[in-house]
């Protein structure tokens, strides 16, 4: 029988990226945090679902905080120090995610809300009757 092939770990090089952009997409069901460099290449990302939350717990502020901490930790390992934050969506995890990034040690230089607003575009879904 042939000798087992040794698998080597990931060959991702550690980049030194001092500043970048954090995109926080916060919906009612989940929060996704993506950290990229200034040219748009994603350095790290995390979400409430990837942090181990399932179902309705993904939409909570605590889940957003956990996701932001995980993404920030990986960005700090790449040498990131200053960030601009772009927030999108109406979810409950917006503020907690920003606060978690600040506590993790990233210096926030700008916070911008980029939630898309329709100029009376598509018809909205019908109202829920519970």
Curated annotation (Swiss-Prot):
SUPFAM superfamilies: Translational machinery components. One of its GO terms (cellular component) is ribonucleoprotein complex. Located on the platform of the 30S subunit, it bridges several disparate RNA helices of the 16S rRNA. Forms part of the Shine-Dalgarno cleft in the 70S ribosome. The keyword Glycosyltransferase does not apply. Keywords: Ribonucleoprotein, Ribosomal protein, RNA-binding, rRNA-binding. It holds the Pfam family Ribosomal_S11. Part of the 30S ribosomal subunit. Interacts with proteins S7 and S18. Binds to IF-3. InterPro entries: Ribosomal_uS11, Ribosomal_uS11_bac-type, Ribosomal_uS11_CS, Ribosomal_uS11_sf. NCBIfam families: PRK05309.1, uS11_bact. GO terms for biological process: translation. It comes from Prochlorococcus marinus (strain MIT 9515). The gene is rpsK. This is Small ribosomal subunit protein uS11.
């Amino acid at each position: 029988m042939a000798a087992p092939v040794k698998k080597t770990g990931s060959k991702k090089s550690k980049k030194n990226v001092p500043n970048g952009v954090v995109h926080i997409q916060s919906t009612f069901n989940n929060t996704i945090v993506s950290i990229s460099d200034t040219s748009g290449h994603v350095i790290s990302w995390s979400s409430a679902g990837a942090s181990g939350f399932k179902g309705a717990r993904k939409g909570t502020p605590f889940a957003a905080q956990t996701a932001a901490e995980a993404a920030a930790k990986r960005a700090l390992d790449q040498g990131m120090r200053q960030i601009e934050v772009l927030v999108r969506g109406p979810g409950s995890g917006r503020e907690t995610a920003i606060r978690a990034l600040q506590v993790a040690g990233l210096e926030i230089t700008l916070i911008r809300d980029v939630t898309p607003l329709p100029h009376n575009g598509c018809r909205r879904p019908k109202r829920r009757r519970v």
